[in-house]
Regions:
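Conserved core of the PLP fold type I
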Residues: 1-122, 127, 133-148, 153, ...
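PLP-dependent enzyme catalytic core of the Aspartate aminotransferase-like
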Residues: 3, 108, 272-273, 284-332
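Conserved core segment of the aminotransferase class I/II
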Residues: 11, 36, 55, 65-71, ...
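Residue-level recognition of strand-loop junctions within catalytic nucleotide-signaling folds
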Residues: 174-175, 255-257, 303-305
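Conserved glycine-rich beta-strand-loop-beta hairpin in the small C-terminal domain of fold type I
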Residues: 215-229, 240-256, 293
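Short, conserved charged micro-motifs
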Residues: 260-266, 307-311
Length: 332
């Protein structure tokens, strides 16, 4: 990536989740003068793990996205709404996942640059959660370039690249910002475990980890998102359903517009036919605005086999048909 890095640019933590805890409380929360510095999520829904990172819950602030909808293909995509997004002197830091858990969304290179530029005006660090990004685990199905910059802290994890139990998080950024996070970690646990790092160092230096990511992990999940999408295209009834563009990560995100019940109620209906999903409202944890869309989405894991995914989507389509049809019948 053309970077000139020293050990002062890098921090190893006990998993990337720890990075967001350090950042949210080092850069966000109340200052000594009593001013509240906000932890901004520029696009919601996003990773639920951010919901508990701040010891000052009121510091978290999330923004509603814009929706690009393809009515014909039954697809849609979230984008940051720059007409609403505010980063100012009250902002402590910005955090977002790329690719995104839960939606599989990839904020574009240009959008990342724009967010970083807005934040740079106020010396605000931007943490890009790259747990699913290249170079490993490389769980992106669309072109994306890891972004670096003076105020960008690039946060990586090896959990999805085959080392979940070792809890290895990697932060790459400006030495001044890395130093702040390092001081926070020193108070918390001195340093992260060395044993997992030794395993990772061997896998990285040999080139095997990058090869595994590109030639095994990425194709494995890319096939599954295709199976899921193709099955929904064939099986879904004539209702306003939209699948988020499958751009990365290990989840699919389904929006059932005008769903006649809540996402939690639909989740219970799916359980009755042996299909387990996660109600989407879980991922709008900070977003307090009343928005019906929040109760109309589902996160679907891609960890099952291709056969199981196809069968589950057929069952989901049948349940959706029954639920929407029951409303039509009740209106007559």
């Amino acid at each position: 990536y053309g970077l000139e890095l020293s050990d002062r640019h890098i921090l190893i933590t006990g998993g990337s989740q720890a990075l967001y805890l350090y950042a949210a409380n080092a850069f966000g929360g109340y200052t000594t003068s009593g001013e509240l510095k906000q932890v901004v999520l520029p696009l919601c829904p996003d990773y639920t793990g951010y919901g508990g990172v701040s010891l000052t819950p009121e510091a978290l602030l999330a923004y509603k996205p814009t929706l690009e909808i393809d009515e014909v293909r039954h697809r849609f995509k979230y984008r940051p709404d720059f007409s609403q997004l505010e980063i100012n002197q009250q902002t402590g830091c910005v955090i977002f996942s790329r690719p995104c858990n839960p939606t599989g969304n990839v904020i574009s290179d240009e959008e990342v640059t724009k967010i970083a530029h807005l934040a740079a005006s106020y010396d605000v660090p931007v943490l890009v959660d790259s747990a699913y990004a290249p170079p490993f685990p490389a769980l992106n199905f669309t072109e994306m370039t890891p972004q670096f910059g003076e105020n960008i802290i690039h946060c990586m994890s090896l959990s999805k690249a085959g080392l979940p139990g070792e809890r290895i998080g990697i932060a790459i950024g400006d030495p001044q910002l890395i130093g702040i996070l390092e001081s926070f970690q020193t108070n918390a646990c001195i340093h992260s475990s060395r044993y997992g790092q030794a395993i990772a160092a061997k896998a990285i230096s040999s080139g095997k980890l990058a090869d595994l990511a590109l030639n095994v992990i990425r194709p494995h999940y890319r096939r599954k998102i295709k199976v899921l999408a193709n099955t929904l295209d064939a099986a879904m009834p004539d209702i306003p359903w939209y699948l988020h563009q499958g751009e990365g990560a290990i989840f699919a995100w389904l929006w059932l517009k005008d769903l006649p019940m809540t996402d939690w109620e639909f989740y219970q209906e799916l359980k009755q036919v042996g299909v387990i999903v996660v109600p989407g409202s879980t991922f709008f944890f900070v977003f307090r605005e009343d928005w019906q869309h929040k109760q109309q989405c589902l996160r679907i894991s891609l960890t099952a086999t291709e056969t199981e995914i196809a069968e589950a989507m057929k069952r989901l389509a049948q349940v959706a048909q029954q639920v929407y049809q029951s409303v039509v019948l009740s209106q007559h």
